[in-house]
């Protein structure tokens, strides 16, 4: 699949960040977890009751979504309709479910 233009990628990444935000809100509500979500442009910050954070941002030059969590830094690249970790091959929402659950100290399922 050919690379997207920067504007195409930013539009796609923006829609994905919208989906992530909605998924985190729904999962937090379902688990009665307190997660503060803030977003500025292509950067989303999730802040948990224990003070820990997860940062998710789009990297247009690399055409990736980057996730910084307590457990490490992860890069996700689009593969068809999915975003997959460039090292482990994990799908974005499965991976985010694990990171968010760890930091919220509650079982949350995104996606």
UniProtKB/Swiss-Prot annotation:
GO terms for molecular function: ferric iron binding; ferrous iron binding. Keywords: Iron, Metal-binding. The keyword Iron applies. Signal peptide: none annotated. InterPro entries: CyaY, Frataxin/CyaY, Frataxin/CyaY_sf, Frataxin_CS. The keyword Transport does not apply. GO terms for biological process: iron-sulfur cluster assembly. Gene3D superfamilies: Frataxin/CyaY. GO terms for cellular component: cytosol. NCBIfam families: FeS_CyaY (TIGR03421). Involved in iron-sulfur (Fe-S) cluster assembly. May act as a regulator of Fe-S biogenesis. This is Iron-sulfur cluster assembly protein CyaY.
């Amino acid at each position: 699949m050919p690379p997207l233009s920067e504007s195409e990628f930013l539009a796609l990444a923006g829609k994905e960040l919208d989906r992530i935000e909605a998924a985190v809100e729904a999962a937090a509500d379902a688990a009665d977890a307190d997660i503060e979500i803030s977003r500025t442009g292509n950067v989303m910050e999730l802040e948990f009751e224990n003070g820990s954070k997860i940062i998710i941002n789009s990297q247009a030059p690399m055409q990736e979504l980057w996730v910084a969590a307590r457990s490490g830094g992860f890069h996700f690249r689009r593969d068809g309709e999915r975003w997959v970790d460039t090292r482990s091959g994990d799908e974005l929402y499965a991976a985010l479910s694990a990171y968010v659950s760890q930091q919220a100290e509650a079982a949350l399922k995104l996606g």
